[in-house]
Amino acid sequence: MNVIETIKKILTDCPLMDEFNNNIHIDYMSLGDVKEMDTGVYPLGTSLVSGDILGNKKYHINFSVFADRKAYEDYDRLNNSGFLLSLTYYLNQLKDIAITENVNGEEKNGVITKISAGNGLLFSVPSGDINDGVTYQIQIGVSYTIFK
């Protein structure tokens, strides 16, 4: 699996994400439909960080992850903030995850060396009415190496 597929799988397998019923999508979600409890994983681009004398390349990719949640009362919003905090702690402890990338038509092995998550916040109220559900965002950065 490449780095994008791997991040989707990490989120799908995360016990904190059980309530989303495997509704985790890449570059899509039905914004504001709290009945669906969707999550959208949006890759924001990959940057080459460095290379070494052996030909290994270090990259960094950022993601925005959006999740629909109910937010009727302060209790719900506090619970949502706690969810984002727990997800941040969960993701930040992950490392050394094997990946495979297709580079110029050739399959290359690699490893995720670090995942950093943060900036979890209430992103939008899609319908304009907080009682219809809201969308939260968390940002994820992934550092990884592709071996020659």
Where are the regions that the model predicts?
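Charged, amphipathic alpha-helical segments and their flanking helix caps
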Residues: 1-23, 45-148
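Amphipathic, interaction-prone secondary-structure segments
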Residues: 29-52
